[in-house]
């Protein structure tokens, strides 16, 4: 595998423990990979496992850390089916849901800004941008979406949308993806 941002999918015949999987994910993350693992499944359910890993990877991008499926189902996750969550995310993101470079840049900026709890400096450092560029992008997002990101409910709604938006852009330029 090279250093491109091309996602890698792998099937692994594995009976590892939850702790062993966490250690594997942490080691991959330390090497610059962002990974997510599905639950173990029989061969007949590989498509479902791939979808689960892909959704976890979307959430991993939003949080900036690798993810495993929860041992207990998240009650909030059960409220929305995957297709419904994606549709809701697309609606909430409105013009930011586009596939053009401006939309991707604004989503990446918003994701980093929310992950850094609104810190202009940490977001700018993470993105390799000037803090005033981050401020401009966030104000543009607020204007384009008609929201006020000083409102915690709006920040929560944007985090929900970004964590469920099918976007495969790494959160860091050197970060690589791996899902299985």
UniProtKB/Swiss-Prot annotation:
Pfam families xref list: HTH_30
Official protein name in the record: Uncharacterized protein in pkwA 5'region
Family (UniProt): Belongs to the CdaR family.
Species of provenance: Thermomonospora curvata
Superkingdom in the source lineage: Bacteria
UniProt lineage: Bacteria, Bacillati, Actinomycetota, Actinomycetes, Streptosporangiales
Transmembrane segments: none
InterPro entries cross-referenced by the UniProt entry: CdaR-like_regulators (IPR051448), PucR_C-HTH_dom (IPR025736), PucR_C-HTH_sf (IPR042070)
């Amino acid at each position: 595998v090279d250093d491109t941002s091309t996602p890698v999918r792998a099937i692994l015949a594995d009976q590892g423990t939850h702790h062993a999987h966490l250690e594997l994910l942490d080691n991959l993350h330390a090497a610059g990979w962002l990974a997510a693992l599905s639950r173990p499944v029989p061969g007949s359910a590989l498509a479902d496992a791939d979808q689960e890993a892909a959704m976890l990877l979307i959430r991993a991008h939003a949080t900036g850390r690798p993810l495993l499926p929860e041992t207990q189902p998240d009650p909030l996750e059960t409220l929305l089916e995957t297709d419904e969550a994606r549709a809701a995310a697309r609606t909430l993101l409105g013009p930011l849901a586009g596939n053009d470079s401006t939309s991707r840049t604004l989503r990446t900026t918003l994701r980093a800004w929310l992950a850094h709890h609104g810190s202009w400096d940490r977001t700018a450092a993470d993105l390799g941008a000037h803090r005033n560029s981050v401020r401009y992008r966030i104000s543009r997002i607020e204007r384009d979406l008609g929201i006020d990101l000083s409102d915690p409910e709006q920040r929560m709604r944007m985090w929900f949308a970004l964590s469920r938006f099918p976007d495969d852009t790494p959160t860091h330029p050197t970060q690589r993806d791996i899902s299985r």
